[in-house]
Amino acid sequence: MTQQEMKKIAAQAALQFVKPDTIVGVGSGSTVNCFIDALASMKDQIKGAVAASKASEERLRAIGIEVFNANEVSELDVYIDGADEITPQGAMIKGGGAALTREKIVSSLAKKFVCIVDGSKQVDVLGTTFPLPVEVIPMARSYVARQLVALGGSPEYREGVVTDNGNVILDVHNFHIIEPLKMEHTINNIAGVVTNGIFAQRYANVTIVGTPEGAKIIE
């Protein structure tokens, strides 16, 4: 079974967490694209969605789902998104698609975060397989990079990428993130950092893993 097929299995299983007459929080990325496609079957049952990226917004509108601005809603029932890495405790690294800041905002509005992944994203310690993305205001890039080196990381500028907010991304290698919540706060306190891709303060309440045997739900 291909990775794409396992993503589709996880995405399909996430529909059970979507309640009728609610506004759904939707993340971004390849697994979320599978979820948006699956959500088309419920488009007449939900009020609409809040999207964490322009790409997701366009995909939702294309299938006829109304998209609301995050400022128009006070709370979301559920937020569905993927992850680049996720631990058994639900802490994640996200931001491979450079939408981490908006993902953090929309997920913070939700009562429940449902993370949909294939098995390759499961790790015991964050930073094992994937660098940590950090969104940075352009003028602070060099300063922030030096601070990340001081923390033990090896930052790499993601060439040619500008976020939906007009900022740049540093991908930090060689972090072995034993205390995700502490590291999330430490990096966010560096002047010029918008946010980083550790999702530990807003962790996943439910993880759905697509496997060849079907969807495995971890709560």
From Swiss-Prot:
Keywords attached to this entry: Isomerase
Recorded GO CC terms: cytosol
Pfam families to which the protein is assigned, alphabetical: Rib_5-P_isom_A
CDD domains listed in its UniProt record: RPI_A
Superkingdom assignment: Bacteria
EC number: 5.3.1.6
Enzyme class, first EC level, given as a word: isomerase
A Gene Ontology molecular function term of the record: ribose-5-phosphate isomerase activity
Catalytic activity reported: aldehydo-D-ribose 5-phosphate = D-ribulose 5-phosphate
Annotated pathway: Carbohydrate degradation; pentose phosphate pathway; D-ribose 5-phosphate from D-ribulose 5-phosphate (non-oxidative stage): step 1/1
Binding site for substrate: 28-31, 81-84, 94-97, 121
Cystine bridges: none
GO biological process: D-ribose metabolic process; pentose-phosphate shunt, non-oxidative branch
Active site: 103 (proton acceptor)
Function according to Swiss-Prot or TrEMBL: Catalyzes the reversible conversion of ribose-5-phosphate to ribulose 5-phosphate.
Family in the record: Belongs to the ribose 5-phosphate isomerase family.
UniProt subunit comment: Homodimer.
Protein name according to UniProt: Ribose-5-phosphate isomerase A
Organism: Actinobacillus pleuropneumoniae serotype 5b (strain L20)
Gene name, Swiss-Prot/TrEMBL: rpiA
